[in-house]
Amino acid sequence: MALTCRFRIPVPSYRGRSRRRRGMAGSGRRRALRRRIKGGFLPALIPIIAAAIGAIPGVASVALQAARKQ
């Protein structure tokens, strides 16, 4: 049986999670857009390429099963 102890230590700079969600209102939207454009075209493609590489085995197995059934 495991025993877990938890302690609450007050941290002065931490204010907890904010209750309200403002979304991307005002200057935040512009800042996010500028950051996205600043990275360039290639960094935007990297997650898409990684997802495609990860999906190759699944696509190949479906194609093999379809070929075996015919």
Swiss-Prot record:
| GO-annotated cellular components | viral nucleocapsid
Provide this UniProt record's keywords sorted from A to Z.
DNA-binding, Late protein, Virion
Q: What residues does the annotated propeptide cover?
A: 1-26, 41-70
**Compartment(s):** Virion
Looking at the UniProt record, the site noted as Cleavage sits at 26-27, 40-41
Is ATP-binding given among the entry's keywords? no
Q: Name one GO molecular function term.
A: DNA binding
**Alphabetized InterPro entries for the sequence:** Adenovirus_late_L2_mu_core
Q: Pfam families recorded for this chain?
A: Adeno_PX (PF05829)
Q: What does this protein do?
A: The role of the precursor might be to condense the viral prochromatin for encapsidation by virtue of the two basic domains.
Similarity comment: family membership:
Belongs to the adenoviridae pX family.
Protein name, per record: Late L2 mu core protein
Instruction: Supply the source organism for this entry.
Output: Human adenovirus F serotype 40
Q: What is the lineage of its organism?
A: Viruses, Varidnaviria, Bamfordvirae, Preplasmiviricota, Tectiliviricetes
